[in-house]
């Protein structure tokens, strides 16, 4: 199967998981990116079962609304039973690198209030050690260079994310993103806490403190379900 076919496979598997495990009338947390889009497309077929969704980005909001799925502000919702999102990398403990699509901060916020984080990914995203995929850090623009120096001191190579015309990429929150190459992140939880403590960092695209509870992994043999231990 192609990568796109695997994404559609896990998108449908996530919709099936929601149908089987989330009661009718609930609100679903939805991530951002091409794999999350496949979940949205599959969820649209059963949208009448649910009140709607909480979105993690402007792009996801637009896609949900295009399917007629009501979008709630997170401040309107007391709790979420499930959050479904993709990953750029996921390790054996359920820690992830996320943020390739630029929505890492809102993704982390929505994931933090969900009872269950369901990661959907193709098998290429499963790695023994995080870091081959550049680690995104969302930063307040005035702190960009200072954060870059801190990254360099740790052995990373900071690269400012830019648009096609060479201008800095601006997140939905009005900030910039540094993508860090050359890392091997043996302690994702510790590294997440370290980077998040730097002044000027909005958040780092490590999802270790709040990692995945479950991964639906698309493989040539179908969908593999991986459950991660709590904590």
UniProtKB/Swiss-Prot annotation:
One of its GO terms (cellular component) is cytosol. InterPro entries: NagB/RpiA_transferase-like (IPR037171), Ribose5P_isomerase_typA_subgr (IPR020672), Ribose5P_isomerase_type_A (IPR004788). GO terms for molecular function: ribose-5-phosphate isomerase activity. One of its GO terms (biological process) is pentose-phosphate shunt, non-oxidative branch. It comes from the Bacteria. The active site is at residue 107. Its EC number is 5.3.1.6. Substrate binds at residues 32-35, 85-88, 98-101, 125. Keywords: Isomerase. Pathway: Carbohydrate degradation; pentose phosphate pathway; D-ribose 5-phosphate from D-ribulose 5-phosphate (non-oxidative stage): step 1/1. It catalyses: aldehydo-D-ribose 5-phosphate = D-ribulose 5-phosphate. Belongs to the ribose 5-phosphate isomerase family. Catalyzes the reversible conversion of ribose-5-phosphate to ribulose 5-phosphate. HAMAP family: Rib_5P_isom_A (MF_00170). Homodimer. This is Ribose-5-phosphate isomerase A. It comes from Burkholderia cenocepacia (strain HI2424). The gene is rpiA.
